[in-house]
Amino acid sequence: MLDERLISSHLLDEDDNNENSIRPGRLSEYIGQEKVKENVEVFITAARERKESLDHVLLSGPPGLGKTTLASIIANEVGKPIRKTSGPAIERPGDLAAILTNLEPGEVLFIDEIHRLNRNVEEIMYPAMEDYVIDIIIGKGPAARTLRLDLPPFTLIGATTRPGLLSSPLRDRFGISCRLDFYTPLELSEIILRAARILEISLDKEGATEIAGRSRGTPRVANRLLRRVRDYALVKGNGNIDFSLAKWALEMLEIDECGLDVMDRMILEAIIGKFSGGPVGLDTLAASVSEESDTISDVYEPYLLKLGFIQKTPRGRMATEHAYRHLGYPLKGNLEGKGLFSDA
């Protein structure tokens, strides 16, 4: 198993430069998320006709679905520069004040992982978002006084993978909220073909479809797999990626037809083989596969839940009928004939 998961939806070191070269710059180039695109286009057009700054935007959804890309596209569409930072990087209220007071009129401020903003920093954000002002306390004790600074109109775009962790006062100040969902295999295939054209990779539709089917519904994963399959095509093939080459390369990378890697299968096999299908507690499961509990719950479980391979119950994790069938295990008696959504 490779040290860094090829199918991780989180950004790996090599992804940043590669993604920048293939990121779309306009809504017309952005593939998928049709409802979100339609709504965003309406909001941008309306703000332009009113000659106002676009309302503040909250982008939520699993990692790797294009929240940062969409933020950059919004800035391009409104014709304003974008300034990027992240929640953990803004440690003190003064850090945020410095950013806000240096914004140009209409500029877009993008804060990734906005759910990780310090609460003291967050309180500075409230009047800035509502009234375009910030209050700075000067001095200490009885001599302290508040200085109010006016800010130019700006648009805040916040991105989060965990919208439930945002405080209600902050969440309620976003006038526009968009949730990005997993992509269909057809959409991913189009994304892969577009990336291949930009990167000058020889790839046919069947090869793109095979890569898309194992990309976990995530463009970041799809683009990463494309680059790894390209390596196999260059070294072990003739440089061209077709269905057979893509299928063989992905099998060499130990990524199956559902997009599961070695650790995904180890988790399912542990639940089925060691714990009779469950239920099994998270800590016990993590110990059985030599992994951290938080890593299991944050990195591996979401996709297994999406596929319906595991269930979370009050007593622990259970493998479903789909997991038994996928791994080729005989069904337990209480699973025989029962689907995940069976009434029985």
UniProtKB/Swiss-Prot annotation:
The EC class name is hydrolase
Q: Which reaction does it catalyse?
A: ATP + H2O = ADP + phosphate + H(+)
One GO biological process term: DNA recombination
Residue positions annotated to bind DNA are K312, R317
> Where does the chain bind Mg(2+)?
T68
**What ranges does the record give for the region Head domain (RuvB-H), renumbered to this chain?**
257-344
Q: Where is the signal peptide?
A: none
EC number(s) per UniProt? 3.6.4.-
**Any idea which UniProt keywords this protein has?**
ATP-binding, Cytoplasm, DNA damage, DNA recombination, DNA repair, DNA-binding, Hydrolase, Nucleotide-binding
Return the NCBIfam families for the record.
PRK00080.1 (NF000868), ruvB (TIGR00635)
Question: Assembly and partners?
Answer: Homohexamer. Forms an RuvA(8)-RuvB(12)-Holliday junction (HJ) complex. HJ DNA is sandwiched between 2 RuvA tetramers; dsDNA enters through RuvA and exits via RuvB. An RuvB hexamer assembles on each DNA strand where it exits the tetramer. Each RuvB hexamer is contacted by two RuvA subunits (via domain III) on 2 adjacent RuvB subunits; this complex drives branch migration. In the full resolvosome a probable DNA-RuvA(4)-RuvB(12)-RuvC(2) complex forms which resolves the HJ.
What's the protein called, per UniProt? Holliday junction branch migration complex subunit RuvB
Native organism is Syntrophomonas wolfei subsp. wolfei (strain DSM 2245B / Goettingen)
